[in-house]
């Protein structure tokens, strides 16, 4: 049959201004931004739009879809969002493999699972994405408006911020290092 490959996340969560026009302008008075219902959108890029049209057409005419996304939360989320955006109506099965050997791939296709078996994994990924959106969009705007200088964006994120804190703390340790005297012990062993 037909084959397709989805290589990227074509459909992320919507931007703040996609939910409310007043959220386009960065203002403390608009915080916190909490959409009544989160939605996805197609990335505005001619290459992505063209690729999505092909995928959408194939999905509309398919008798069955096999989700071959990465075996994990993010792979599940990326593929589900594309299928949702494309309006896929046919049955969906899941290829779940963690090895790319010929044998593993063959076994995976012989043991396809119902997409519904992965609903909790999708919901976990969706919850993570929404949490990242809420923290990132709101905290970035808050810190930028309060502390950013010369229109400098201060980006805040669930992974990025603690990682940067580790780097800053380590740099401070290096800069504040004070050598201390120490002794070396030398011993002689006898048989």
Functional labels for PLM-detected ranges:
Residues 2-133, 137, 143, 162:
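Intrinsically disordered, low-complexity regulatory segments
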Residues 128, 132-191:
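Prokaryote-biased recognition of long, low-complexity C-terminal linker/tail segments
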């Amino acid at each position: 049959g037909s084959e397709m490959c989805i290589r990227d996340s074509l459909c992320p969560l919507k931007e703040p201004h996609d939910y409310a026009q007043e959220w386009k302008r960065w203002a403390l008075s608009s915080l916190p931004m909490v959409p009544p219902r989160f939605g996805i959108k197609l990335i505005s890029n001619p290459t992505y739009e063209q690729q999505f049209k092909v995928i959408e057409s194939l999905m509309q005419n398919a008798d069955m879809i096999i989700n071959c996304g990465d075996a994990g939360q993010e792979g599940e989320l990326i593929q589900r969002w594309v299928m949702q955006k494309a309006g896929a109506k046919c049955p969906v099965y899941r290829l779940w493999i963690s090895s790319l050997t010929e044998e593993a791939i063959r076994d995976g296709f012989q043991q396809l699972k119902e997409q519904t078996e992965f609903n909790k994994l999708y919901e976990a990924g969706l919850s993570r994405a929404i949490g990242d959106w809420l923290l990132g969009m709101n905290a970035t705007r808050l810190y930028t408006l309060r502390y950013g200088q010369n229109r400098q964006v201060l980006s805040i994120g669930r992974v990025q911020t603690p990682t940067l804190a580790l780097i800053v703390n380590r740099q401070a340790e290096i800069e504040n290092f004070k050598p201390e005297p120490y002794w070396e012990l030398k011993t002689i062993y006898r048989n």
